[in-house]
Amino acid sequence: METPSEPSAQHSKLEISMHHPVRTRSRAVFSLALVIAVFVFFNRSTGLAGDTAQSQAAFDPPEVRPSSDVVPPALLHGPHYQLGPTVKTFTFMNQYSVTSDYGPFSPPSDARLRRLIREIAAIAELKKIHESDAFAKATVEAGKGVVQGAQNLIKDPVSTISAVPEAVFSVFGRVSEAAKRGGRSQYEDGVAQNLLAVSSFKREYAQKLDVDVYSSNQVLQKELNSVAWAAAAGNLTLGAASMVTGAAVLQAASGLRTLDQAKNLVNALPATELARRNREALRQMGVPNVVADRFLQNHVLSPRHETVIVEAMKTLRGIPGRTAFIQYAARADNEDTALLFQEMAELLAGYHRTVTPIRRLDIYLNIPVAYTGQEIAVVLLPIDRLLWTERSSGIAVSLAQSLPKPLPVQHLEVWLTGDASIRAQEGLKQLSITLVEHAGERLPLLD
């Protein structure tokens, strides 16, 4: 069994939180600060930040660049959306503005922009379904009485559910696991939707459209809910071909996928079953119950976040440090950091599987550090663009000068899913840190 250790306080071109309508400026600034906080840890007693500031003649200011300099031409605009003219970049993430037929959006990272483009195409496809004869017929069928039961369930769920035989619950959910989880995450459907199999239809449509069924995009959720209710209550049936044809743009923006097993599980199983499987997997890894509970009961983590993280840790079979990473991910306090932890886990699994086997995993300065058998320590970061700032340079100096070495280390590498500024490239080089840019092309993420 691994010994849990408390973590320290703490993309390819083109993810962190995106809601509709557009966030207020204060909300955006707050979320950005939380993302930065994941990477930043300074012990004032070391004087590290001050020393770094004195040793560096210049730092990068925030960047404002033309969107055409950052985003591939094919993604600048589509049938239902248009990117804003500029991209703002702070220390780690690119910030976008998007106008669309379904309202404005502000995706605060490359990966979230890719996700939004797929979601916009999915929304358009779902709206086509609303206009179809099949949807109109299903709506009529739903109005003949099936919906009344749903309305009763929504208005008085306790008394309605109490009349359902116990055997039904074994089909629609794991009551004991739901109790262990202490409720559902902010991304999941309610009791009514689950009991009426609406959630099952939502997962099916989300899979066909290549979108995350637990997405926080409110417009997408509204459209998915509408079509899924018609399917559950009105026997709406649609062939796979009709879904795929209208979603061709999604495939172009999707790219290669890793951890397909995790993705398939999320699309196939209800949240309670995912939680049960994840709990058992954590037990087999030797993760203490108290750590597993903290992780699975953190409702900022969606079932998708949790499942991808657990499947990634399973890939690192027998490696010391997995408990520390689960404990680290359990600290997610908003959707942005939840996604960041998921992507870190994906990068670790991808590196271990396709580059070099990892022998040990530690959390240092709130950043996962992987140690290989080739005397290499590697830091894998799902960030869009690294600017050389007082904070980022301080982290780099600490990694170069005081990184713990539980295994022999002769070489330190930093892999970024995005790229780095000229100053950041030079700064890392002076510290003898090898920089690998655009790692997302070699280690693609699920978005």
Residue ranges of model-derived segments:
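Cationic, glycine-rich low-complexity segments
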Residues: Q56-G182
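Amphipathic interfacial helices
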Residues: I123-E177, R184-G246
